[in-house]
Each structure stands twice: as C-alpha cells, then as structure tokens.
C-alpha cells in the first residue's frame, strides 16, 4: 500500500527537514511512502533545499513551487493533487511524525476506511511537551465509525470536543485518494482556510446519498 505525505508549506524550511527526518526514521512497516510538497512561493530557501533532501532521504520527494502565493486553501488542494498513493496523509509543514506511526497506521489502513482521524501531541518549538494541552479531538478511545449509519454519524459528532474533530487539523487527516478525487470542489470555500474540510465532509455526505 502506498501513502502520500501531502505537505503544503510557506517559509518553513527550518521545520520541513525535521518532518522529513521523522518520516525517514519510521520502522517496522512495509508501506510505500512518497512526499509531495506544495510550496506557496516561499522566500526562505525551501526550493534550494529540495535537492539536498532528495539525496538524503529514502523516499521520493516531489516538489511544486507556485510562482505566487495562492493562499492556504489552494495550496492544501495542490498538495493533495500531487499525491499518487492509495491514501494521502495531509501534513502541516511545522509538525513531525511520532515514532512507529506508520507501523500503527499500516494495520489501521488495512481496514480500507475512507477517512482516518489521528489525534496529536502538543509540543513547543523546543520539542518540550506542553503542560496544558488542548482537549482531545474526541471523547473516548480509538474506534471505527460507519458514517453511512445514521446512529454512528450522530454518535461521532456528539463525541467531538473541538473543531479538530471536524477534520480541520491538517496533520490529523488521512484520506483515501480516490474518494477525495471524486468530490467536485465548490470554489466558494476558497478563502476560508477550510477547503479540505469541505471535501472531507462531502465524502461523508456521499456515503449517505
């Protein structure tokens, strides 16, 4: 199975290297990994660093630099559109992947669900755990929800603690690429910074249509 890390970025060259290192250091999995970076016209040397990273890391890195800043929404969509994997893991360029995440997700992805929502650990810029983190996305532990089942759908949204539970936080989201591609995007959501949420909710809506 192939996973595309779809990374929108703007002037975060000092963070991207740590993210790529965290992906490279994953072990005990057999997933095929690619990295797709959509650059919103960064001016901090991101483009110049790409070839260095390509030589250093053990996965292909695909890079697209826009000639001008196209805004966050279009950059999110651009990053996912670059992916060729079975699943796209939409990842913020200032976050990192925790140890054994790919081994854990390989087991979960075998179920073939359309969308996976991961929680997060909150660290400061020195990678120290924040003492008073925000609430978890959902009440309760890990479980599978079937959104084609009305009772499951209601239960899921009743368990949401924050907007992160509504698929807003980039690095938490893994989506089946063909389901994403099937959605016809509504351009009126450009400028909201939640274009990706629209697509994910449309995927859920399509399960019930």
Predicted regions and their residues:
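Nucleotide-sugar donor-binding/catalytic module of glycosyltransferases
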Residues: 1-209
């Amino acid at each position: 199975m192939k996973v595309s890390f779809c990374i929108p970025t703007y002037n975060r060259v000092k963070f991207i290297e740590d993210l790529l290192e965290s992906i490279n250091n994953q072990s005990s999995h057999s997933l095929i990994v690619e990295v797709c970076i959509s650059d919103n016209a960064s001016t901090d040397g991101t483009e110049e660093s790409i070839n260095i990273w390509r030589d250093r890391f053990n996965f292909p890195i695909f890079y697209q630099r826009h000639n001008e800043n196209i805004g966050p929404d279009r950059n999110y969509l651009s990053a996912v559109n670059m992916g060729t994997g079975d699943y796209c893991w939409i990842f913020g360029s200032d976050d990192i992947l925790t140890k054994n995440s790919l081994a854990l997700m390989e087991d979960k992805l075998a179920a073939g669900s359309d969308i996976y929502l991961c929680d997060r650990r909150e660290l400061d810029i020195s990678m120290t755990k924040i003492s008073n983190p925000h609430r978890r996305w959902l009440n309760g532990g890990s479980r599978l929800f079937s959104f084609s089942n009305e009772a499951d759908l209601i239960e899921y949204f009743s368990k949401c603690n924050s907007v992160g539970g509504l698929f807003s936080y980039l690095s938490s989201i893994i989506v089946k690429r063909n389901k994403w591609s099937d959605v016809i995007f509504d351009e009126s959501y450009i400028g909201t910074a939640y274009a990706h949420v629209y697509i994910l909710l449309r995927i859920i809506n399509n399960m019930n249509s």
